[in-house]
Amino acid sequence: MLWILGPHTGPLLFDAVASLDTSPLAAARYHGDQDVAPGVLDFAVNVRHDRPPEWLVRQLAALLPELARYPSTDDVHRAQDAVAERHGRTRDEVLPLVGAAEGFALLHNLSPVRAAIVVPAFTEPAIALSAAGITAHHVVLKPPFVLDTAHVPDDADLVVVGNPTNPTSVLHLREQLLELRRPGRILVVDEAFADWVPGEPQSLADDSLPDVLVLRSLTKTWSLAGLRVGYALGSPDVLARLTVQRAHWPLGTLQLTAIAACCAPRAVAAAAADAVRLTALRAEMVAGLRSVGAEVVDGAAPFVLFNIADADGLRNYLQSKGIAVRRGDTFVGLDARYLRAAVRPEWPVLVAAIAEWAKRGGRR
């Protein structure tokens, strides 16, 4: 089951999270890092490791003496070519981004008349479109959050969907996504977490389609949240429209170098091997959470969405024990019953704390 919320513009887009003690816009701008303090065991943020790999740190550090130099066309081309080779695309189908989130901030340049966003999902697309005065309709999926293309408005000329989706972790079939294509419509697929799925079987990143825009993040996989790196894949025409209003030199040399390095064959192979290990770890974590009464949403992302009795009370209890998880009620389509936890090797600590919470009868 699902329903459609909208049309709304401005802060009214976010009245589904009015239970928060913040403004609706602030609730939508809430992200997992706000739950994390120094020394906390972090299950709230979906960055893979505590720091980038040493080889990447060395490569970026070697460029520090060159920071007086403006980014060159060659720097941009090296980044584009690495991405193009990784996905079997051409250079002019690649747009380096300041994180995948910049891609959402640029969507208003496509001048959509009616945008549809499949939710629960990352909140930035709705914020960016609303800020530009563009009507955004939420297509709200009900548990188990499986995509039903029939409920996306036929007249939507921009459709945004995540795959796998943050925060639900659900991985939609590529055939379902392709069903969303329509004449005059651009389909935007947020694949920020696609490279965490072994083999990436449902990805559209390798498909040269004139009406499909794929957004990718390197921030999470390579632990570069402080640098902000990602890219878009699309037709040259769509990318030109997307960047019609964009600052000059949008990415610095460190960002462009990171994109090229993280899309090199050896790095891609390392990330793929890590994705296999992560999938096994996720299965163990899911079993552990279910053993203490959590209802876990079936998914394939590097995080787990689950609902549990008195989730808000549990979150506060975990926080008192130095454990951070992500609240779910700031996402349109979720409520206070839901929590999201990143897949971490330390998952037994989280499960043990939940078990202790339950043993106490839900009391601190």
From Swiss-Prot:
Its cofactor is pyridoxal 5'-phosphate. Keywords: Aminotransferase, Cell wall, Pyridoxal phosphate, Secreted, Transferase. It is found in: Secreted; Secreted, Cell wall. Its main location: secreted. PROSITE patterns: AA_TRANSFER_CLASS_1. Pfam families: Aminotran_1_2. Induction: Up-regulated during macrophage infection. The modification N6-(pyridoxal phosphate)lysine is found at residue 220. GO terms for biological process: biosynthetic process. GO terms for molecular function: histidinol-phosphate transaminase activity; pyridoxal phosphate binding. It catalyses: L-histidinol phosphate + 2-oxoglutarate = 3-(imidazol-4-yl)-2-oxopropyl phosphate + L-glutamate. Coiled coil: none annotated. InterPro entries: Aminotransferase_I/II_large, NHTrfase_class1_PyrdxlP-BS, PyrdxlP-dep_Trfase, PyrdxlP-dep_Trfase_major, PyrdxlP-dep_Trfase_small. It comes from the Bacteria. Its EC number is 2.6.1.9. Transmembrane segments: none annotated. GO terms for cellular component: extracellular region. It is an enzyme of class 2 (transferase). Monomer. Aminotransferase that catalyzes the conversion of histidinol phosphate and 2-oxoglutarate into L-glutamate and imidazole acetol phosphate. Might play a significant role in mediating histidine biosynthesis during infection. Facilitates mycobacterial survival and virulence in macrophages. Rv2231c is recognized by host TLR4 receptor at the macrophage cell surface to regulate downstream signaling cascades. Inhibits macrophage activation and production of pro-inflammatory cytokines to dampen innate defense. Can inhibit macrophage apoptosis. Was identified as a high-confidence drug target. Belongs to the class-I pyridoxal-phosphate-dependent aminotransferase family. This is Histidinol-phosphate aminotransferase Rv2231c. It comes from Mycobacterium tuberculosis (strain ATCC 25618 / H37Rv). The lineage of its organism: Bacteria, Bacillati, Actinomycetota, Actinomycetes, Mycobacteriales.
